[in-house]
């Protein structure tokens, strides 16, 4: 890690002997050359082997040496003192005064100096700036004054530091003045959909690069991100990915920054600390007591837990462990991968979502950022409670949805996959797969929530292979009846309960269809006798509905197993000699019912 504790002292370049109020030579003040044309701007002011200060994504300057220059992308390949290497944009590189006698403006690269836009020399780095080129504009009183003047770059270099910028001293006051304006136009920045990164890599007051998921604050008004090192309102150093703040920058407030801590819950503390541990140690799983709780206790003051601050140290572990076990869509236990059960990690390594941005998750889930994007993890339902949603994954009780989007998208996927597998012949000849008609959404809540969790990828637990035909799955109709081969019959018959329809493992033969037809004939005969009697005795439809939900697998066969949330995978498809289509299906062997 680069050391930037002495960023301000790293400006060891020799300053220009010219004073800020000293008139520049005549040759430098002329606006044109002898031929009457303006001086041509140099293509690049950097040289290979040149020592420079480069601003990193934390807002601090680090000393490095230029090894390569890319004029097309306006960037330099720099090797830093700790042997790390990176491409840095020209806008984030600061050089010392040039050794030549000519002085040009660092911004416009022009060498003229005339009122009211004279050239002013920085007393720290020796760079020259036109009064109107510098941000903010340099007042004319600075030219006539004997006090030292520092350019914007040097003010930030001497005041910014880890944990927050200086709050007292002349340089701190100068920083506050500099922060009233930005060296770029916020409206010109091209942001991503989540407003977390922009194409120009321009953030904060300093205009340098940044990583929103590390130590940065987002202004709730202009939505720009600001480095921890550049703000002056922090009382304690920030944690990585800690966005539980209401922050207003100096530009929007037209004065000092505004900062307010948002309340934390135990799940937020566990999530935030696990994220910090993963960033620091570059691994996923941590011991919940030896590592996680140690980190929480050591950084208890930096967490600013609010109402939880008075919780005794002996009781904290109980609350944290409860949160780790309750939010299974957010945390992953080691026992899921055959490790120790007291090991925990984040399912997706993203920072926790603060409550003040929960309303934006419907438009842009947290997991869609390009740094942490994982395919197939996108919430499709509106988010009503920030505690039920984490990083774009909707919590549905203890059932987790991994690897595919839930909700309507899954139903469409089932429909598209299943429709080609069906025809009228297969439906009429396979009674165990007959399905109900139209769906009653309000009456089949528990049922429909399970149907959306069908997984085509299979599972790692015990499996069994059977042959059946996959068909479209629907919910319960309002009449709580279903249509079967042209006749109406009740959906729930207690004494005719059968098993789930799992056939013994055997080779698929044409005689299977004959067995199915025999069973269908017997079944139709029984239902014909009981049809009128049962319809007259269905007084309490609510009880019948509950019974139907509990025994749905008895009548729907393979579709019933799908309705109960059992995962399956289609392994093969074949057409028999008599034209029947059969499928080889691998079942997980366990359902959610």
From Swiss-Prot:
Entry function: Polycomb group (PcG) protein that specifically binds histone H3 trimethylated at 'Lys-36' (H3K36me3) and recruits the PRC2 complex, thus enhancing PRC2 H3K27me3 methylation activity. Regulates the transcriptional networks during embryonic stem cell self-renewal and differentiation. Promotes recruitment of the PRC2 complex to the inactive X chromosome in differentiating XX ES cells and PRC2 recruitment to target genes in undifferentiated ES cells. Required to repress Hox genes by enhancing H3K27me3 methylation of the PRC2 complex.
Segments of this protein annotated with the region Disordered: 1-35, 360-411, 424-486
Keywords linked to the UniProt accession: Chromatin regulator, DNA-binding, Isopeptide bond, Metal-binding, Nucleus, Phosphoprotein, Repeat, Ubl conjugation, Zinc, Zinc-finger
Superkingdom, natural source: Eukaryota
GO molecular function, one term: RNA polymerase II transcription regulatory region sequence-specific DNA binding
Localisation per UniProt entry: Nucleus
Lineage: Eukaryota, Metazoa, Chordata, Craniata, Vertebrata
Annotated family: Belongs to the Polycomblike family.
Tudor domain span: 44-101
Originating species: Homo sapiens
Pfam families in the record: Mtf2_C, PHD, Tudor_2
Chain positions found as Phosphoserine: 452
Name of this protein: Metal-response element-binding transcription factor 2
Family annotation (SMART domains): PHD (SM00249), TUDOR (SM00333)
């Amino acid at each position: 890690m680069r050391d930037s504790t002495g960023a301000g002292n790293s400006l060891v370049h020799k300053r220009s002997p010219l004073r800020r109020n000293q008139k520049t030579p005549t040759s430098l003040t002329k606006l044109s050359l002898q031929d009457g044309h303006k001086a041509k701007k140099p293509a690049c002011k950097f040289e290979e082997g040149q020592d420079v200060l480069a601003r990193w994504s934390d807002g601090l300057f680090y000393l490095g040496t230029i090894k390569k220059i890319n004029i097309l992308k306006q960037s330099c390949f720099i090797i830093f003192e700790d042997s790390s290497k990176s491409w840095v944009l020209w806008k984030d590189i600061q050089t010392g005064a040039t050794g030549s006698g000519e002085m040009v403006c660092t911004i416009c690269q022009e060498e003229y100096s005339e009122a009211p836009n004279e050239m002013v020399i920085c007393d720290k780095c020796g760079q020259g700036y036109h009064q109107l080129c510098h941000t903010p504009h340099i007042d004319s009183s600075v030219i006539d004054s004997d006090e030292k003047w520092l350019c914007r770059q040097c003010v930030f270099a001497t005041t910014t530091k880890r944990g927050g910028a200086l709050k007292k001293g002349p340089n701190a006051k100068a920083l506050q003045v500099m922060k009233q304006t930005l060296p770029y136009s916020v409206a010109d920045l091209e942001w991503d959909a989540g407003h977390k990164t922009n194409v120009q890599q321009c953030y904060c007051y300093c205009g340098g690069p940044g990583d929103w998921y590390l130590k940065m604050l987002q202004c709730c008004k202009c939505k720009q991100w600001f480095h921890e090192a550049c703000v002056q309102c922090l009382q304690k150093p920030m944690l990585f990915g800690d966005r539980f703040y209401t922050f207003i920058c100096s530009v929007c407030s037209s004065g000092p920054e505004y900062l307010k801590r948002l309340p934390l819950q135990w799940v937020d503390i566990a999530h935030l600390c696990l994220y910090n541990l993963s960033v620091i140690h570059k691994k996923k799983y941590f011991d919940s007591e030896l590592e996680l709780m140690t980190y929480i206790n050591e950084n208890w003051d930096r967490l600013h837990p609010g109402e939880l601050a008075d919780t005794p140290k002996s009781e904290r572990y109980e609350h944290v462990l409860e949160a780790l076990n309750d939010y299974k869509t957010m945390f992953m236990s080691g026992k899921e991968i055959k490790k120790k059960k007291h090991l925990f990690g984040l399912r997706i390594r993203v920072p926790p979502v603060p409550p003040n941005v929960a309303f934006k998750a419907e438009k842009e889930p947290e997991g869609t950022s390009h740094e942490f994007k994982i395919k197939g993890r996108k919430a499709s339902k509106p988010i009503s409670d920030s505690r039920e949603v984490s990083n774009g994954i909707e919590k549905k009780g203890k059932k987790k949805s991994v690897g595919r989007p839930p909700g309507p998208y899954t139903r469409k996927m089932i429909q598209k996959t299943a429709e080609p597998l069906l025809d009228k012949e297969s439906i009429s000849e396979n009674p165990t797969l007959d399905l109900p008609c139209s769906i009653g959404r309000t009456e089949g809540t528990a049922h429909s929530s399970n149907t959306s969790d069908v997984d085509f990828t299979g599972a790692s637990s015990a499996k069994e292979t059977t042959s059946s035909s996959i068909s479209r799955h629907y919910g319960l109709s309002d009449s709580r009846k279903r249509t079967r081969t042209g006749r109406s019959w009740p959906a729930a018959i207690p004494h005719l309960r059968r098993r789930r329809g799992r056939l013994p493992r055997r080779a698929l033969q044409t005689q299977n269809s004959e067995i199915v037809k025999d069973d269908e004939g017997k079944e139709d005969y029984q239902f014909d006798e009981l049809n009128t009697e049962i319809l007259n005795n269905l007084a309490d439809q609510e009880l019948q509905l509950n019974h139907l939900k509990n025994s749905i697998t008895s009548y729907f066969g393979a579709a019933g197993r799908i309705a109960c949330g059992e995962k399956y995978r289609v392994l093969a498809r074949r057409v028999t000699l008599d034209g029947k289509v059969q499928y080889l299906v691998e079942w997980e062997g366990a359902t959610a019912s």
